[in-house]
């Protein structure tokens, strides 16, 4: 007897996250596919359409740039170490060499969080 789509969905809804992860792995192996997200390409158009699409396209990766260490350089170094996982000397060199990127290619929410942490420590930072 074949299961209906509704029965399959109900069974999946009752699974734990671990069970779902294992199910996905087994499906990938059985069907020879990958569950990785696929980027959808924009439709090709004339030059004017391409320029319009580029202007509307939202930036998805951001860089957080430390522009100045601020008055309390020690706190800034501590925050940079916490954010980047760098050693003391590397974090100090980064802070002393400002403006320098602290995090590159991160999501907007993470970039804003990193900037807020740096500003809270007394540093100046910007998101590009």
UniProtKB/Swiss-Prot annotation:
InterPro entries linked: Ribosomal_bL12, Ribosomal_bL12_C, Ribosomal_bL12_C/ClpS-like, Ribosomal_bL12_oligo, Ribosomal_bL12_oligo_N_sf
UniProt GO molecular function: mRNA binding; structural constituent of ribosome
Pfam families, per database record: Ribosomal_L12 (PF00542), Ribosomal_L12_N (PF16320)
Gene3D superfamilies per UniProt: 3.30.1390.10, Single helix bin
GO biological process: translation
Keyword Ribosomal protein recorded: yes
Record flagged with keyword Kinase: no
Keywords linked to the UniProt accession: Ribonucleoprotein, Ribosomal protein
Xref: CDD domains: Ribosomal_L7_L12 (cd00387)
Cellular component aspect of the GO annotation: cytosolic large ribosomal subunit
Family as reported in the entry's similarity comment: Belongs to the bacterial ribosomal protein bL12 family.
Protein's UniProt name: Large ribosomal subunit protein bL12
Lineage of the species this protein comes from: Bacteria, Pseudomonadati, Pseudomonadota, Acidithiobacillia, Acidithiobacillales
Gene that specifies this protein: rplL
């Amino acid at each position: 007897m074949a299961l209906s789509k509704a029965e399959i969905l109900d069974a999946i809804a009752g699974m734990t996250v671990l069970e779902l992860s294992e199910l996905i792995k087994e499906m990938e192996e059985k069907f020879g596919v990958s569950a990785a997200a696929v980027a959808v390409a924009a439709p090709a158009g004339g030059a004017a359409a391409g320029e319009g699409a580029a202007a509307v396209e939202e930036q998805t990766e951001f860089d957080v740039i430390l522009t100045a260490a601020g008055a309390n350089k020690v706190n800034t170094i501590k925050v940079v170490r916490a954010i980047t996982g760098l050693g003391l000397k590397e974090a100090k060199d980064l802070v002393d060499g400002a403006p320098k990127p602290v995090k590159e290619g991160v999501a907007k929410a993470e970039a804003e969080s990193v900037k807020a942490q740096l500003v809270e420590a007394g540093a100046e930072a910007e998101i590009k």
